[in-house]
Swiss-Prot record:
Keyword Lipoprotein set for record: no
Subcellular location as annotated: Secreted
Signal peptide segment: 1-28
Tissue specificity note: MTYamide peptide: Expressed in the larval CNS (at protein level). NAP peptide: Expressed in the larval CNS (at protein level). IPNamide peptide: Expressed in the ventral ganglion of the third larval instar and adult brain (at protein level).
Protein name: Neuropeptide-like 1
Major site of localization recorded for this protein: secreted
Region spans: Disordered: 126-147
SS bond list: none
Biased composition (Acidic residues): 133-144
Biological processes per GO annotation: neuropeptide signaling pathway; receptor guanylyl cyclase signaling pathway
Length: 309
């Protein structure tokens, strides 16, 4: 049994080897085209077979077919120029280079006008536009700096800045090149100092600071009016305790006022005949303020009395 399996396996290897040899012998004969250097001697059948192979190649020969397609296009163009019948190839979509979409692929085939695309390569070859050593930085006609320099570092290296190449505010302050000689390096502080008068202090931006600043410079007579806190107003010498002590003292009686007896109102309410015997001075002096105490008992119910208690 093992011998049969080994013989079958060896026969399969032989069949695979024979098929590979047949493919290698037949494939080149179908691809090779007997073309000579003279393009006029190419037969139409050979041209058609060549075009078919170029237009529909196998995926593994895609790059090679693209190169052959470009070569065929160049041959057709040379033939038209030699005959004198120049015909634009753009009408035929088969000859368009739609497969070339990468700049690197176009540059590799020499289809770009400028093969150098890298700034580093152009700089190494000396192809970058540079100014001459004796050429002025500014434009001679307009008197203004050239618009080619847009970077602050380039302007500083070329001497186009007004501060001798210094670009840092801290460096300018250390070198005493700032317009304000007090060493201020903050842009907001510089702007405030430039806008303020020379004899004036720093402008106060806080309400409390403004109030203190005004009270210290010629506004002492209005010191009491500038108080904003009730406690400060109460303890101030103008509006506080001393002002109360300066007023005339009012003497209060030592004993309590002689008010009428509150129970007296209940005595005369049931009988209205004793109005003439009442002392109206005592009644007015009592000044009843509670409605339940003023109304007669007949109109004030027991429930209202309980709620008031």
């Amino acid at each position: 049994m093992q011998a049969v399996l080994q013989s079958a396996h060896s026969s399969r290897r032989l069949m695979l080897l024979l098929s590979m040899l047949l493919n290698a012998a037949i494939q080149p004969r179908s691809i090779i085209v007997s073309a000579t250097d003279d393009v006029a001697n190419v037969s139409p059948c050979e041209m058609e077979s060549l075009i078919n192979q170029l237009m529909s190649p196998s995926p593994e020969y895609q790059l090679h077919a693209s190169a052959l397609r470009n070569q065929l296009k160049n041959l057709l163009r040379e033939r038209q120029l030699a005959v004198g019948e120049e015909q634009p190839l753009g009408e035929y979509p088969d000859y368009l280079e739609e497969d070339k979409r990468s700049v690197a692929a176009l540059a590799a085939q020499g289809l770009l006008n400028a093969p150098k695309r890298s700034l580093a390569t152009l700089a190494k070859n000396g192809q970058l536009p540079t100014a001459e050593p004796g050429e002025d930085y500014g434009d001679a006609d307009s008197g203004e700096p050239s618009e080619q320099k847009r970077y602050i570092g380039s302007l500083a290296r070329a001497g186009g800045l007004m501060t001798y190449g210094k670009r840092n505010v801290g460096t300018l302050a250390r070198d005493f090149q700032l317009p304000i000689p007090n060493g201020k390096r903050n842009i907001a502080t510089m702007a405030r100092l430039q806008s303020a008068p020379s004899t004036h202090r720093d402008p106060k931006r806080n309400v409390a600071a403004v109030a203190r600043y005004n009270s210290q410079h010629g506004h002492i007579q209005r010191a009491g009016a500038e108080k904003r806190n009730l406690g400060a107003l109460k303890s101030s010498p103008v509006h506080g305790v001393q002002q109360k002590r300066e007023d005339e003292e009012m003497l209060l009686p030592a004993a309590a006022p002689d008010y009428a007896d509150p129970m007296q109102s209940y005595w005369w309410y049931p009988s209205y005949a004793g109005y003439a015997d009442l002392d109206w001075n005592d009644y007015r002096r009592a000044e009843k303020r509670f409605l339940g105490r003023v109304l007669p008992p007949t109109r004030a119910t027991a429930s209202t009395h309980r709620s008031r208690l």
